[in-house]
């Protein structure tokens, strides 16, 4: 029995150490991405595909580090999105102008910085910016995303360290 005890302890430590990783992977898998419209090679953007998506992120779900092969605008319409820029550039956070003119920049998220984006604000993501996001506040987050990506590129590309 005494010889088995160290093996049992090691096995338990491995299970405990990997449980958080497995839980995070399961939570990220619960994200719903509905492509509402898709248009390839729109006028003035040959070699690109334009998308309109509705992304629903369950409460407490973390989207791991990723980037996009093109620009995106994401309008948060429900909940609060905790958004972190890891590297690769700045992301502007804007709010609509009530007169329909140019949106007002309310914040610029620098690399290494996190900002909570509430419903009513939008993020403007340049291509290639590595970032992650999380639905915070105990509520789901719904974001409408307009993307202009390189033809054939996936909607997002996960970054592995």
Where are the regions a protein language model picked out?
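Soluble periplasmic/extracytoplasmic beta-strand elements of cell-envelope proteins
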Residues: 75, 82, 144-147
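A short hydrophobic beta-strand segment most commonly corresponding to one strand
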Residues: 138-154
């Amino acid at each position: 029995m005494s010889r088995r005890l160290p093996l049992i302890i090691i096995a338990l430590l491995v299970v405990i150490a990997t449980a958080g990783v497995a839980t995070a992977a399961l939570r990220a898998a619960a994200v719903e991405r509905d492509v509402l419209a898709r248009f390839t090679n729109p006028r003035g953007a040959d070699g690109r595909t334009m998308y309109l998506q509705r992304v629903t992120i369950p409460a407490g779900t973390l989207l791991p580090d990723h980037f996009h092969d093109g620009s995106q605008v994401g309008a948060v319409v429900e909940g609060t999105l905790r958004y972190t820029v890891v590297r690769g550039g700045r992301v502007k956070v804007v709010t609509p102008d009530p007169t329909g003119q140019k949106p007002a920049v309310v914040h610029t998220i620098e690399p290494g910085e996190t900002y909570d984006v509430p419903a009513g604000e939008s993020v403007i993501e340049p291509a290639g910016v590595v970032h992650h996001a999380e639905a915070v506040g105990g509520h789901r987050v719904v974001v409408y995303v307009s993307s202009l990506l390189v033809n054939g590129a996936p909607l997002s590309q996960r970054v592995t360290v």
